[in-house]
From Swiss-Prot:
Function: Component of the cuticle of the larva.
Name the UniProt record assigns to this protein: Larval cuticle protein 65Ag1
Organism expressing this protein natively: Drosophila melanogaster
N-terminal signal peptide: 1-18
GO CC term (a single one): chitin-based extracellular matrix
InterPro entries: CHIT_BIND_RR_consensus (IPR031311), Cuticle_Struct_Prot (IPR050468), Insect_cuticle (IPR000618)
Superkingdom of source: Eukaryota
Amino acid sequence: MKFLIVFVALFAVALAAPAAEEPTIVRSESDVGPESFKYDWETSDGQAAQAVGQLNDIGTENEAISVSGSYRFIADDGQTYQVNYIADKNGFQPQGAHLPVAPVA
């Protein structure tokens, strides 16, 4: 009987907890062309992302896309993190205050 009372009490507390508010989009822009793109968005909770991409060496065997941008998010610990990056023929190259930096060879 005690188990049932404790279970019902915990269930009631769980139902009474306030629901987390879903973030809404406060800004969203994009422009997509045949050889380039860009986008920029932000949500009400402070998350954001922006990027610009461009097709390089069009019409050659070295044709490749390069993208530069950044994104910002709030982690489970409540801290905001930002990552700036370049993604091109050399791979994804992120930078951020919270990311380790490779030693210079």
